[in-house]
C-alpha cells in the first residue's frame, strides 16, 4: 500500500471568509516567510497575540503553509513535466498511488480530458521516462500524455494578494 498524500485530499471548496487581517498576515509572510509575529503585528497595527492566533487558524484550516521553496533546476533536477492520466474507473486509487512518490510534487483529480494530472520533478530525461513508465504500469491506467517542460516562464506563490472580493469579510 502506498503512503497517503501529505495533505488530505478533498474537493475544491470555498473555505471560510478571510478578512483584511488574514490577508495582511498572508501577504507579510509571502514577502518574508521568516517575518516575526511581532514585526507583522507592528506593520498592520494589531497585537502580536492576534497575529499568532490568526496564523495558527490559517495553518489549521490549511489556507497557509510557510515553507522553503526550492528551484528544482538549482538542485540538479533537470527534467520536469506534466503527465495527463486517463483511468478505467475511479481515479482516486491511481492518484493516491502517484501522490506517494517523491517525484510527484503535484497530483490532482480533474474533470476534462484527463482524470488525473501529475507534475513530476526528475533527475534527467531517463528518470522521467522511468517514472512515466511506472505510471503506465499502475492498475487502472488506460493512457498517459506527457508534457516535457522546456522553459520555466513563471512560477509564483503570491495568491494571498489576490483574494477574491466576494471571499473577503468586512
What does each model-identified segment do?
Residues 1-170:
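A compositional/biophysical signature of low hydrophobicity enriched in polar/charged and small residues
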Amino acid at each position: 500500500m502506498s503512503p497517503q498524500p501529505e495533505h488530505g485530499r478533498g474537493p475544491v471548496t470555498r473555505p471560510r471568509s478571510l478578512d483584511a487581517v488574514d490577508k495582511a498576515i498572508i501577504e507579510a509572510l509571502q514577502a518574508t516567510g521568516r517575518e516575526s509575529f511581532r514585526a507583522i503585528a507592528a506593520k498592520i497595527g494589531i497585537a502580536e497575540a492576534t497575529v499568532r492566533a490568526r496564523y495558527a487558524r490559517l495553518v489549521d484550516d490549511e489556507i497557509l503553509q510557510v515553507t522553503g521553496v526550492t528551484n528544482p533546476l538549482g538542485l540538479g533536477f533537470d527534467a520536469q513535466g506534466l503527465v495527463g492520466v486517463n483511468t478505467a474507473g475511479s481515479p482516486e486509487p491511481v492518484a493516491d498511488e502517484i501522490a506517494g512518490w517523491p517525484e510527484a510534487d503535484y497530483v490532482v483529480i480533474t474533470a476534462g480530458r484527463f482524470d488525473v494530472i501529475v507534475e513530476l520533478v526528475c533527475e534527467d530525461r531517463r528518470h522521467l521516462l522511468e517514472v512515466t513508465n511506472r505510471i503506465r504500469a499502475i492498475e487502472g491506467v488506460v493512457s498517459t500524455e506527457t508534457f516535457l517542460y522546456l522553459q520555466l516562464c513563471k512560477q509564483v506563490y503570491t495568491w494571498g494578494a489576490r483574494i477574491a472580493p466576494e471571499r473577503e469579510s468586512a
